[in-house]
Amino acid sequence: MEAVTQPGGFSPGLAARVRTRDGSRCFVKAVSELANPDTPSLHRREAEVVSALPPEASVARLLWTYDEGGWVALGFEDIDGHTPAQPWREDELRLVVDGLHRLHDVLTPTPIDSAAAGDGFATHIKGWSELKSSRAPLDTWAARYLDQLVDLEAQAPAAAAGDTLLHFDVRADNMLIARDQVFFIDWPWARIGAPFVEWLAFAPSVYMQHGPKPEELLRMVPLAAVDDSVINAVIASLAGYFLAYARRPPPPGIPTVRAFQAAQGQIALEWLRERTGWR
């Protein structure tokens, strides 16, 4: 038997590629409620989502689950691949862009019931109202336009409406490249909405990891049918979310996530400043 821990990501639990005595392989993720009280429910949700995805979806297949004594473990098909290189390589980014397009096509209309992306923006993927009420110190530009940012993010729930099942957490550490194909992994946050929302949420992490600027990434993605004001509303909500959550204490077992959110928040904020032309 052999187990090799896999680096990356923000889960406080085990993530390992495992080879059993009979030579079979799988990828195992497991967590105890003592490590983080919220993560076991995320593993359960991921099992529900992945087990219901159609065979055409480019995902690692769920093989088994274990849920007992405060521990939840999931066994997935072992994908012999790698996460995208950092800094981003142009060929791998193009592969991801094409793969995410295909995934959206396969998952439209949604094959499963799930919460709406708009509900997420209405309840927690936002932050400007929180930052305003807390009187938190802000970037000069954000402070100048704080009321407008509050109003703009309030439009995001309606803007996000759609009938595609979105991964809703697309980042380099949530994908594997193997055999010139991209496999999208880690599905607990899946929601139903408009595909453009996925691209907007993905873009700040690409630039943070030394890929193209968000607007350059959007030029790789045909979003001609989406109004600029709708795009700006979602970017505003994402920026507010990242910046507000970055000020909170880190969740148990995930000490680095707030710095990750802060970096993406600053990128999203600068992106929004450039798009709005507000000075």
Language-model features: locations:
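Regulatory N- and C-terminal appendages and interdomain linkers associated
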Residues: 1, 263-279
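A conserved alpha-helical element in kinase catalytic cores
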Residues: 26-68, 86-102, 197, 206
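Conserved short submotifs of the Hanks-type protein kinase catalytic core
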Residues: 69-82
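Active-site activation/catalytic loop segments of kinase-like enzymes and analogous catalytic loops
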Residues: 196-226, 235-253, 267
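Active-site acidic catalytic loop and adjacent metal/ATP-binding pocket
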Residues: 9-19, 27-28, 152-197
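Short, flexible/disordered intra-domain loops and linkers
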Residues: 34-41, 249-259
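An alpha-helical support segment within catalytic cores of ATP-dependent transferases
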Residues: 108-167, 222
